[in-house]
Amino acid sequence: MNPGFDAVDQETAAAQAVADAHGVPFLGIRGMSDGPGDPLHLPGFPVQFFVYKQIAANNAARVTEAFLQNWAGV
C-alpha cells in the first residue's frame, strides 16, 4: 500500500471494472467507516461498528446530494 493513502477501496474498483466492461457510466461515492483509532472513544464492538457505519452513511449521502445538486446546476 502506498504510504500516501489512508484507505484502499477494492469493492468500488471492482464495480467500476464491470461497468467499464459493459460500457456503463459509473460514479462511486463511498463513506469510510473504519479509520485509525477511535476519535469518539466509544466502547468496542458492536457499538463502534454501528456508530461509525451510520456516520459513514450520512457522510456519503451528503456528498452524493451535493454532487447531484452541483451536476444539475441547482
Curated annotation (Swiss-Prot):
BP terms from Gene Ontology: nucleoside metabolic process
Q: Which InterPro entries match?
A: Nucleoside_phosphorylase_d, Nucleoside_phosphorylase_sf
Q: What name has this protein been given in UniProt?
A: Uncharacterized protein Mb2315c
Q: By its UniProt entry, which Pfam families does this protein fall under?
A: PNP_UDP_1
Q: Does the keyword tRNA processing apply?
A: no
Keyword annotations from UniProtKB, A to Z: Signal
Hey, what's the signal peptide range on this chain?
1-19
